[in-house]
């Protein structure tokens, strides 16, 4: 039996691009689309409801990470076997959804990332030079920290197996942009298999993009995250953030049995 595929869209003022993003989704592969609105001031909610999406609304702008927390929690409640995050700003190609879920369906990966740096020249596709080179540097640093060899971690196009989202404690993560890297670090700490596919990217006026200042803060927070991860991995300072929930519950059950409380 094929897993239930649910697309989640973390949205903030996406009225101009939401419809075109949704229309390009290959519906034959998707059982449900969940949109979480993070305090938009435009017509995002109205358009989402017009498209018959399942809509959840934050009463104010809590942040990109907070939006994803609601996305994944609601997708799991809805019985998703595979959860695909698609930004509603049309920056990533929705038609590549079959490719991004296939490694999970084939049992080859628990998390698949859509890499813009594997697809050719991101600079030619419009990625700002400062964003391109900082992406390359941070990805190299993460590869060193994680012991992996991927071409990009800073993508908003990603697919998760249900079991991975149940294992990582994503509720402990930031409500901001660094959530994207925290959940990857958690996946690595849990021993998840991570794959990637090449995806093109579009940069245009309506597409959302972090400013230079936001990107600088994001980069500094990644450095702090990697320091915490390395300390956890080496055993110098264990962090609950990187512990598998499955293992924690199993350890708790064993402890209760040992003390005769079960």
Regions found by a protein language model. Name each.
Residues 1, 147, 171-262:
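Hydrophobic helical membrane-anchoring modules
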Residues 12-27:
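Short, well-formed alpha-helical segments that are part of the catalytic scaffolds
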Residues 80-91:
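Short beta-strand-to-loop acidic/aromatic patch adjacent to the donor-nucleotide binding site
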């Amino acid at each position: 039996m094929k897993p239930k595929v649910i697309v989640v869209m973390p949205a903030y003022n996406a009225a101009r691009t939401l419809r075109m993003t949704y229309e390009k989704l290959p519906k034959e592969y998707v059982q449900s689309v969940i949109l979480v609105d993070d305090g938009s001031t435009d017509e995002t909610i109205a358009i989402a409801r017009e498209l018959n999406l399942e809509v959840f609304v934050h009463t104010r702008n809590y942040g990109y990470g907070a939006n994803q927390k609601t996305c994944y929690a609601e997708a799991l409640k809805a019985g998703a076997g595979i959860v695909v995050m698609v930004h509603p700003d049309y920056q990533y190609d929705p038609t590549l959804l079959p490719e991004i879920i296939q490694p999970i369906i084939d049992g080859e990966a628990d998390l698949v990332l859509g890499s813009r740096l594997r697809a050719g020249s991101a600079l030619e596709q419009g990625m700002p030079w400062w964003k391109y080179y900082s992406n390359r540097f941070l990805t190299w640093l993460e590869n060193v920290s994680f012991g992996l060899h991927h071409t990009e971690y800073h993508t908003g196009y990603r697919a998760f197996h249900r079991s991975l989202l149940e294992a990582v404690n994503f509720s402990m993560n930031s409500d901001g942009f660094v959530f994207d890297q925290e959940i990857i670090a958690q996946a690595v700490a849990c021993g998840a298999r991570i794959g990637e596919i090449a995806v093109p990217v579009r940069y245009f006026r309506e597409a959302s993009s972090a400013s230079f200042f936001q990107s600088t803060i994001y980069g500094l927070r990644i450095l702090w995250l990697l320091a915490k991860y390395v300390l956890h991995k080496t055993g110098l300072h264990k962090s609950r953030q990187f512990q598998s929930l499955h293992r924690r519950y199993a350890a708790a059950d064993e402890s209760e049995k040992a003390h005769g409380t079960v």
